[in-house]
C-alpha cells in the first residue's frame, strides 16, 4: 500500500492524494456474492428528503459480506483481496474447505493464501473470529457483535479496532476507538486484529467532482440561505448567523447530545465525551 501524490496537471489534481494498493484484485468481483442496489438519493418512500447532500454518483453493486462468521471449525483460505465501493475497508474473498466462498472484512496484515478459522477453538490470530469469552483480555479486536448472532456492528471501518479490557460475569468491557467503554455479552463474536486499509484517512479528494462520483452533493451554509430555509438565513448583505450554530430545524450543532436510546444506556460504562 502506498500514498501517491498525483502530478498537478490540473487544479483538481494538484491537491489530490491517492491510496494505491497493488495487492487488490484487478478483475471483476465474485458474481454470486453481488446484489443490486438502487439509489434513493436521500429520499424516503414518500419521495421526501430525509438525508441531505445525497444524490447522483456512480452505480454500484452491493457486496454481500459475512458479518456473522458462523462456519465454525471449517478452515478457510484467502483467495484474494478486493476493493469495496460501499465501505472504507477492503474485503477478502475466502474459500472454505467445503467449497463455499464468502466475503469478509479484510483485517490488517491479511495476505492471499492465509488460513482463517472461526469458532471457540480457533487460534488467537488476526482474521480469526471467536466468541468474546474465548478471547484473552487485552487483545485488539474488530467486527464486534452487539447481540449474539446478529452479526458484527462495531469497529468495521478502515483502520478501526477496539480493546478487550475485562470480563465480568456474562459481560465483557470493550474500549472503542472513540474512547467509549461498552459492555458486550461474552457470547458475542469478534474478530482478532484491526481492520486494514488504515491509510484510507490520508487520502485527499482533490476536487468537488470526486465527491459527486461518490454520490455526495454540495453542502450549503445556513448564512447563505433565506430566513424561510434556515435559522441563520437572511440579513442585508453578508451577515453573521446572529445566534449559536444550529441545524436547519433549530437543534444546536456544536456538542449537543441527541442520543435518545435509553434502553441500552446501561451498556455504556463510560461515554466517549468523558475521556
UniProtKB/Swiss-Prot annotation:
GO biological process, any: cytoplasmic translation
Start-end of Polar residues biased regions: 35-49
Compositionally biased spans, kind Basic residues: 50-59
Organism superkingdom: Bacteria
The entry's keywords: Ribonucleoprotein, Ribosomal protein, RNA-binding, rRNA-binding
Positions of region (Disordered): 35-59, 224-275
Entry keyword annotation includes rRNA-binding: yes
A single Gene Ontology CC term: large ribosomal subunit
Molecular function via GO: rRNA binding; structural constituent of ribosome; transferase activity
InterPro entries: NA-bd_OB-fold (IPR012340), Rib_uL2_dom2 (IPR014722), Ribosomal_uL2 (IPR002171), Ribosomal_uL2_bac/org-type (IPR005880), Ribosomal_uL2_C (IPR022669), Ribosomal_uL2_CS (IPR022671), Ribosomal_uL2_dom3 (IPR014726), Ribosomal_uL2_RNA-bd_dom (IPR022666)
Protein family: Belongs to the universal ribosomal protein uL2 family.
Function: One of the primary rRNA binding proteins. Required for association of the 30S and 50S subunits to form the 70S ribosome, for tRNA binding and peptide bond formation. It has been suggested to have peptidyltransferase activity; this is somewhat controversial. Makes several contacts with the 16S rRNA in the 70S ribosome.
Oligomeric and partner information: Part of the 50S ribosomal subunit. Forms a bridge to the 30S subunit in the 70S ribosome.
Name listed for the protein in its UniProt record: Large ribosomal subunit protein uL2
Gene name linked to the record: rplB
